[in-house]
């Protein structure tokens, strides 16, 4: 039996980039397991290594090329997939590392498997029964990313994602719901809905009607959110483009059907800069919508991202952005100094902002937002809330509230936690806060 196990091909896997890339990795790993391959956590024990790359910004390209180089040095047999593989037909990778066995773009499961088969033939009689219904996941067992579409129809001038991942392709709604149901049945307590543009879900198929559990469902974000809310777990929406119909999901949040959490990348507040970015709306429209959202759902948490130092951004336009920030009072914010990305249309725009000015603006922006975030967190002191346990160590636990997405938001630290496990919901009382996180005490042993 031992000799048979040694003959089973083993594959190492490196996954870089965003949650959408993580889902691609999970799909590849699921197929590998279905075909009888084993996975290895070390380069030494692997017969071959797959590296799923990111190519969005220069630092991501550098990280991906470094990871490929490390895999080649430690193992020697490397297949590259992901967004970096789509750049210049894979030439960026091949020029840096000509020894790689194959290069593919993102969401290229058939091509990756073909390369694996060529360089490491699949074993006979794969034990497909070893595959759980929810597939192979790289996240903790109690939460999972649910990717509802690929690609994007927008052509934001700072972004090259459409050139790497293509135009919008929505997954059939019955497929999404079946995957969500399998995940929940496997013990997942939180579904994180992701795509390049979640609010555009179904646009490419004209909101086609599908069927789930014998009832019709439109391929549309609102209908999907409502149906996911029936599964009895936390449902969190990410990457929501600020279309008008986004307003329709806010009542679902107020009713407790989905989490009162919205991740909306506003990017800027200056109408001229937004136009140069080829982004919709303007700051006044966005501010009025934020006010309406909070009127309908007072507990809503708003996360957004912004770019400072975009080509041509004047001091007055930066001040306009800061005024928007003060007025909007967003809960969670990420800010990036504009970085030219090879192939992005914005590179051709005039009046680039000097690097030192970009960094000064980013630091100023984040100092203001940190104060806003700290003040909003401090308002939660003395309140009770349900949190989801992520980790337990001795008598302490780390959890997240409805306001906290994994990896990107804050945490809730619980001292003297009793009888709790990762993936459980418990009630806590907030006793103090800092600029990013909350500290709490456990209210009772009762778990929900």
Curated annotation (Swiss-Prot):
Positions of disulphide bridges: none
HAMAP family: MTTase_RimO
Subcellular compartments: Cytoplasm
Annotated GO CC locations: cytosol
All residue ranges annotated as the Radical SAM core domain in the record: 138-375
Ranges where the MTTase N-terminal domain occurs: 9-121
Entries under CDD domains matching the protein: Radical_SAM
Name under which the protein is recorded: Ribosomal protein uS12 methylthiotransferase RimO
Keyword Zinc assigned: no
Gene name as annotated: rimO
């Amino acid at each position: 039996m031992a000799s048979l196990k040694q003959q089973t091909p083993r594959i190492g896997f490196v996954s870089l980039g965003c949650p959408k890339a993580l889902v691609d990795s999970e799909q590849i790993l699921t197929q590998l397991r279905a075909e009888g391959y084993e996975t290895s956590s070390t380069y030494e024990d692997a017969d071959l290594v797959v590296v799923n790359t990111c190519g969005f910004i220069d630092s991501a390209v550098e990280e991906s090329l470094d990871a490929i180089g490390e895999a080649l040095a430690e193992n020697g047999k490397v297949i590259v997939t992901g967004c970096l593989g789509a750049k210049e037909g894979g030439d960026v990778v091949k020029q840096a590392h000509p020894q790689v066995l194959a290069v593919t773009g993102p969401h290229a499961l058939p091509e990756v498997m073909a390369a694996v088969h060529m360089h490491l033939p699949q074993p006979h009689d794969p034990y497909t029964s070893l595959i759980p219904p929810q597939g192979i996941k790289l996240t903790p067992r109690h939460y999972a990313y649910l990717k509802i579409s690929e690609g994007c129809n927008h052509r934001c001038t700072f972004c090259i994602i459409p050139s790497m991942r293509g135009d919008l392709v929505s997954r059939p709604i019955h497929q999404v719901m079946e995957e969500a149901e399998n995940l929940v049945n496997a013990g997942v307590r939180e579904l994180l809905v992701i795509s390049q543009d979640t609010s555009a879900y179904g646009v490419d198929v004209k909101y086609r009607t599908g069927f789930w559990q014998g009832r019709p469902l439109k391929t549309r974000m609102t209908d999907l959110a409502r149906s996911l809310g029936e599964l009895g777990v936390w449902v969190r929406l990410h990457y929501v483009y600020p279309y008008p119909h986004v307003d329709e999901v806010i009542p679902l949040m107020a009713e407790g059907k989905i989490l009162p959490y919205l991740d909306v990348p506003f990017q800027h507040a200056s109408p001229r800069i937004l136009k140069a970015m080829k982004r919709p709306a303007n700051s006044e429209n966005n501010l009025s919508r934020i006010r309406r959202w909070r009127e309908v759902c007072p507990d809503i948490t708003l996360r957004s991202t912004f770019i400072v130092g975009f080509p041509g951004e004047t001091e007055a336009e930066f001040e306009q952005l800061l005024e928007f920030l003060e007025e909007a009072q967003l809960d969670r914010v990420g800010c990036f100094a504009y970085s030219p990305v090879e192939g992005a249309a914005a590179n051709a725009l005039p009046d680039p902002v000097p690097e030192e000015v970009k960094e000064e603006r980013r630091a100023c922006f984040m100092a203001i937002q940190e104060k806003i975030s700290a003040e909003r967190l401090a308002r939660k002191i003395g309140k009770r809330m349900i949190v989801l346990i992520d980790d337990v160590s001795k008598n302490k636990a780390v959890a997240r509230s409805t306001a906290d997405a994994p990896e990107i938001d804050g945490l809730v630290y619980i001292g003297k936690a009793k009888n709790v496990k990762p993936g459980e919901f418990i009630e806590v009382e907030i006793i103090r806060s800092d600029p990013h996180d909350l500290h709490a005490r456990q209210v009772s042993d009762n778990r929900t």
